[in-house]
């Protein structure tokens, strides 16, 4: 008999959400998290501590293809990278799942389409209590349900910017936000519309991150166990190499192994690939799930561009991440 019915490696957006969904099943579930709990402390909202001193960045050293070291600036905590995310929760568009042509090459179509994912988007928006408004963004894909909560109102300067963009022929909209804000009774709201939502931890637990909305609700079920400071280092398989049966991990200076009927690898794009490659055996000499020899290759990081503007007028906005524009989503 296995130690657990399900072992989930990683407690971020994937693992934390899955744990919450599986918890009511009564199955014996183990969560393995390489990090610990992110402390609720005054430094959470300190620009100097967060961005200059890198208080919450892992000291990991990684190596590029030429062996040169670099610091990836990743975060390892219960809740994963969502502990410092901006809580903007968008859906991919239908076209994103198809073949896309770029100057550097072709991105092949996914084996699934948007329609396959739509019910899960709706479920996730409920789990993460997303605030938004359907119908404002002309690029948004079809949905089977409205957002679970109304959109967050813009502050005056952001509203003026929205109006100006609309006057210029664009289609600004209220960004879908995962924050626990009650505009009807702000005096009892968990979210206080602070100026530190994007890129900072939330000491109020008002951000809908994977710890607050996933792991903590899951741990209310007695069948769910969480081990922190427990990085997975290798997956074991059955003798035929047809199924993963266990996980080797480090904790408190020693190495332990647990077995599970189902093992979920949800420790981020890079670290999931690393774990699969590190689990090579005689049946899988190139690493698990790597018959294509593509695991760990072709990684595309979260790509973004920034536009900065200087204003002659003061901008008193505090809670500013409520506005979105997708008119140029596909570069048209």
Where are these regions (language model features)?
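Glycine-rich, aromatic-lined ligand/substrate-binding cores of catalytic
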Residues: 312-332
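N-terminal Rossmann-like FAD-binding beta1-loop-alpha1 element of flavoenzymes
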Residues: 6-31
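Conserved redox-cofactor binding core of oxidoreductases
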Residues: 65, 101-232
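Short Gly/Pro-enriched turn/cap motifs at secondary-structure boundaries
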Residues: 73-75, 205, 296-300
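Hydrophobic or amphipathic alpha-helical targeting/insertion segments
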Residues: 31-34, 81
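Glycine-rich loop(s) and the adjacent beta-strand/alpha-helix scaffold that form part
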Residues: 24, 35-40, 44-45, 221, ...
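Redox-cofactor-proximal catalytic regions of oxidoreductases
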Residues: 50-138, 312, 319
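Short, hydrophobic/aliphatic alpha-helical segments
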Residues: 3, 58-73, 254-260, 327
């Amino acid at each position: 008999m296995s130690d657990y019915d399900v072992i989930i490696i990683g407690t971020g957006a994937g693992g934390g959400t899955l744990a919450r969904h599986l918890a009511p099943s009564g199955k014996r579930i183990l969560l393995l998290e390489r990090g610990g709990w992110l402390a609720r402390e005054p430094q959470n909202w300190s620009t100097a501590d967060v961005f200059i001193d890198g208080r919450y960045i892992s000291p990991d050293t990684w190596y590029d293809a030429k062996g040169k070291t670099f610091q990836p600036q990743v975060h390892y905590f219960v809740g994963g990278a969502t502990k410092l995310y901006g809580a903007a929760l968008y859906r991919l568009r239908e076209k994103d799942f198809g073949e896309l042509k770029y100057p550097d090459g072709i991105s092949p179509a996914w084996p699934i389409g948007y329609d396959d994912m739509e019910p899960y988007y709706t479920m996730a928006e409920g789990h993460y209590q997303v605030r938004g408004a359907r119908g404002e963004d002309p690029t948004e894909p079809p949905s089977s349900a409205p957002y679970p909560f109304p959109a967050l109102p813009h502050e005056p300067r952001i509203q003026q910017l929205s109006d100006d963009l609309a006057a210029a022929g664009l289609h600004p909209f209220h960004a879908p936000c995962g924050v626990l804000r009650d505009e009807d009774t702000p005096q009892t709201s968990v979210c206080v519309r602070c100026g530190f939502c994007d890129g900072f931890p939330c000491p109020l637990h008002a951000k809908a991150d994977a710890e607050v909305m996933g792991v903590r609700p899951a741990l209310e079920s007695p069948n769910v166990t969480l081990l922190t400071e427990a990085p997975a280092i290798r997956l074991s398989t059955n003798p035929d190499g047809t199924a993963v049966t266990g996980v080797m991990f480090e904790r408190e200076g020693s190495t332990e192994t647990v077995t599970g009927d189902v093992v979920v690898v949800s420790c981020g794009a890079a670290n999931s690939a690393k774990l699969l490659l590190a689990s090579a055996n005689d049946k899988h000499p190139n690493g698990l799930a790597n018959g294509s020899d593509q695991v760990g290759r072709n990684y595309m990081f979260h790509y973004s561009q920034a536009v900065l503007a200087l204003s002659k007028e003061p901008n008193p906005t505090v809670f500013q991440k409520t506005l979105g524009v997708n008119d140029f989503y596909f570069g048209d």
